[in-house]
Amino acid sequence: MATEGTTGSGSRVVAGMVCSLWLLVLGSSVLALEEVLLDTTGETSEIGWLTYPPGGWDEVSVLDDQRRLTRTFEACHVAGLPPGSGQDNWLQTHFVERRGAQRAHIRLHFSVRACSSLGVSGGTCRETFTLYYRQADEPDGPDSIAAWHLKRWTKVDTIAADESFPASSSSSSWAVGPHRTGQRVGLQLNVKERSFGPLTQRGFYVAFQDTGACLALVAVKLFSYTCPSVLRAFASFPETQASGAGGASLVAAVGTCVAHAEPEEDGVGGQAGGSPPRLHCNGEGRWMVAVGGCRCQPGHQPARGDKLCQACPEGSYKALAGNVPCSPCPARSHSPDPAAPVCPCLQGFYRASSDPPEAPCTGPPSAPRELWFEVQGSALMLHWRLPQELGGRGDLLFNVVCKECGGHGEPSSGGMCRRCRDEVHFDPRQRGLTESRVLVGGLRAHVPYILEVQAVNGVSELSPDPPQAAAINVSTSHEVPSAVPVMHQVSRAANSITVSWPQPEQTNGNILDYQLRYYDQAEDESHSFTMTSETNTATVTRLSPGHIYGFQVRARTAAGHGPYGGKVYFQTLPQGELSSQLPEKLSLVIGSILGALAFLLLAAITVLAVIFQRKRRGTGYTEQLQQYSSPGLGVKYYIDPSTYDDPCQAIRELAREVDPTYIKIEEVIGAGSFGEVRRGRLQPRGRREQAVAIQALWAGGAESLKMTFLGRAALLGQFQHPNILRLEGVVTKSRPVMVLTELMELGPLDSFLRQREGQFSSLQLVAMQRGVAAAMQYLSSFAFVHRALSARSVLVNSHLVCKVARLGHSPQGSSSLLRWAAPEVITHGKYTTSSDVWSFGILMWEVMSYGERPYWDMNEQEVLNAIEQEFRLPPPPGCPPGLHLLMLDTWQKDRARRPHFDQLVAAFDKMIRKPDTLQAEGGSGDRPSQALLNPVALDFPCLDSPQAWLSAIGLECYQDNFSKFGLSTFSDVAQLSLEDLPGLGITLAGHQKKLLHNIQLLQQHLRQPGSVEV
């Protein structure tokens, strides 16, 4: 009998075909391995399995279906048995070691005779047999062998043949298969496969039960499935036994990353430290359900698909773990060795800590160029140009080093100098400057300094060399004059502009002359021109017609030039227009003649207008004039858009149509009654880009709204003045309909002033009012009445130039404009230039009060009563008397006694030239004495502390200042003077004036009998 070791060898074969064990089948499976536990296929020697009862199964040698001799177990005891005789023949294998298998598979080769061919009737013949198994930790001993068939067996299945074969008629003994004369032929076989488990003990037995069949068991093969070892996703997975549960059950196998690989992060991306990869082996020995994987470490790239990670070659790198190829080294870097995670920079070049590895190496910048400065009293504005070489970076910054020197020396003679005192300060800061200028303050007069400007960037600290720098020797004097506060236009022509300005507020000596700098706004400011004037007036000639020019002026004393004042912009007249100032020497006779001719011509045109009025319905705008006169005689006119049936026709004649492709629309900056207002850019072909404000008409608006919208644009397009909002163009041929005007960055004048309370001198506020008055003088020359003049209808640009807007606004039904309305407007609805003068006076009060609401919180009826009783607004805190007197002139009840706008402009010019006139308190003998309104009086009995008093007057921001300096009673506050306020931290001029005004009221209250001190 052959031993079990010879029949159940541990050899392994690939199921189905001969192929590589490492073949990875994409899509989740690999061919399974069969771990053979027992195999009788082709066995020729005695097998020796146990049978019961003896003779129930016979072990014989027969030819198989390949005509090979093989050992076979046969059972066929149905012939000759009486009906009803039962069969119970058992065949048991030897003890089979499971060898780690969790489930066993059995493959049976057998043949069954057909009962019909045996001539057996009744139920004694079967064509099936039953398969069993039982587990054991040890082989059966001698005592157990005798009763093996009585042990507890587990049924696997009843095995039925797919085909049964007839009995051979020529064979005297039992035979299976067709008969050939003179020899035994090969068997015809069925093949069945079953599995059982899970297996938990050392081994098992398999048994076959025959209950009345005629069959031959030709071959038995017991095996288990194993998933082979594989390389997948840069990880190796070991050989793994299939699950004992079979079917879809899975066994997880943990993989090991190949050399120079690491587990992938559990999340998306990230560094090393993820869970090891896993594959799952199913019950048929096939890999599936991959979880995770490995990735090549920094400095390594994939090779042979996803099997290996190899080092990056010289001159390349890979900074992060991942399965991407290496990259060539960035500019100015090189990796001399393989497996580089980053390419080191070449000598003289660096990477900042914030630079990624893929960034090119960069260097420090070169030194700044062309340092120069402008002295501003004890301070100076230091300028420089950008370095020639930026080092390949965009994070350029500047540091300023200040050295105070004991004597005059070159910048290189640092041994004589020391670090500047702490009193020297820098605005906006000393280090990390982003712009090429800095204001240096706190310098001592007549002390030589060296200012050094260093250029640095993100890699300057990595360089062993100090930052490249440029230095300049500077010295300041307190005696230079201060800045000229304001400048205004006296007259203009097509090729010239005459400007005038007041003396600096601090002359610090005798003014020797003034230096005027000017440039064309259409060109770069660096192309500016200068001229010198010994007076405070200058005429600039050789200018281009219709161009806008920027002007600045500074004064010079023996100590040197003071700083330039702010930029102011004026425009020359278009070619062919008359000068804005008539020659002073014009003959009275010529003037009389021209006046007579103008009167006659006006009368003639008026008669013609009446005659043809009925015939002009729908005619061109050029025939419908608000005032009829000849422009050749210097009398101006404008066209009233409301007389047009089609506002688009007026737009075509009076405004420039803009191609929408030239417009770039940006963010929303506001909204009006017609639609949103957006910031934008306009760049017609061949012209410089300019910032504009774009108002688009609401979609779906009424036709009347569109007519009003376009009518206002047509009106605005007729006026060209530096202090009137400029129309840049319109879009009417596409949707939405848009109106483009110049951009006024600082918005309405009232809100602008409220946000900057106390930040301007009286002269600067006068200059703002002068600009508005000049615009109204220009409009009144056209007999145009604004009707809605107020601080909110005036816009301010970034150069503090005030421009009148909202032309054509209809105030009818708008009670909100009552506070600016003249008495005749309130009572009779009569709008004239004189009513605009009244409104301008209210605007003056708004300016001097920094945007305070006229008449404060009085309701409309109270305002009407006050005006009717001839009460007038009092001077705002800090308002010069001369300005308030001018306001009172504009508020004369008799409109004929109010000044004209040209008189107001002349008054402002006089104040600017001679600032002492602002303080003049004398009045005209013709001016009636007018009662002045007071703001809402403070309820002193309800104010229990200086802190409550500060809140009542709107200066609660200084409550901590009062507490810090022990101002706890009204008596303490009443003793404060102007000199005390800076020491309390109250430096804004407007706040100082407001506080002093209310201190005076407080003093009056404390002097009253019965007042209680708190």
UniProtKB/Swiss-Prot annotation:
Keywords, alphabetical: ATP-binding, Cell membrane, Glycoprotein, Membrane, Nucleotide-binding, Receptor, Repeat, Secreted, Signal, Transmembrane, Transmembrane helix
Chain span(s) of sequence motif PDZ-binding: 1012-1014
Pfam families: EphA2_TM (PF14575), Ephrin_lbd (PF01404), Ephrin_rec_like (PF07699), fn3 (PF00041), PK_Tyr_Ser-Thr (PF07714), SAM_2 (PF07647)
Annotated Fibronectin type-III domain residues: 364-479, 480-575
Segments on the Extracellular side according to the record's topology features: 33-591
SAM domain segment(s): 941-1005
Residues on Cytoplasmic side: 613-1014
Tree of life domain: Eukaryota
Listed GO biological process terms: activated T cell proliferation; positive regulation of T cell costimulation; T cell mediated immunity; type IV hypersensitivity
GO cellular component, one term: extracellular region
Binding positions for ATP per the UniProt entry: I669, G670, A671, G672, S673, F674, G675, E676, V677
Tissue expression pattern: High level in thymus, and brain. Very low levels of expression in kidney, lung, liver, bone marrow, skeletal muscle, spleen from 2 week old and adult mice, heart, testes and embryonic stem cells.
SUPFAM superfamilies referenced in this protein's UniProt entry, alphabetically: Fibronectin type III (SSF49265), Galactose-binding domain-like (SSF49785), Protein kinase-like (PK-like) (SSF56112), SAM/Pointed domain (SSF47769)
Domain Protein kinase: 663-912
Membrane spanning stretches: 592-612
Residues of this chain annotated as glycosylated in UniProt: N473
Subunit structure: Interacts with CBL and EPHB1. Interacts with FYN; this interaction takes place in a ligand-independent manner.
Role played: Kinase-defective receptor for members of the ephrin-B family. Binds to ephrin-B1 and ephrin-B2. Modulates cell adhesion and migration by exerting both positive and negative effects upon stimulation with ephrin-B2. Inhibits JNK activation, T-cell receptor-induced IL-2 secretion and CD25 expression upon stimulation with ephrin-B2.
Domain notes: The protein kinase domain is predicted to be catalytically inactive. Its extracellular domain is capable of promoting cell adhesion and migration in response to low concentrations of ephrin-B2, but its cytoplasmic domain is essential for cell repulsion and inhibition of migration induced by high concentrations of ephrin-B2.
The name this protein goes by in its record: Ephrin type-B receptor 6
Gene that this sequence comes from: Ephb6
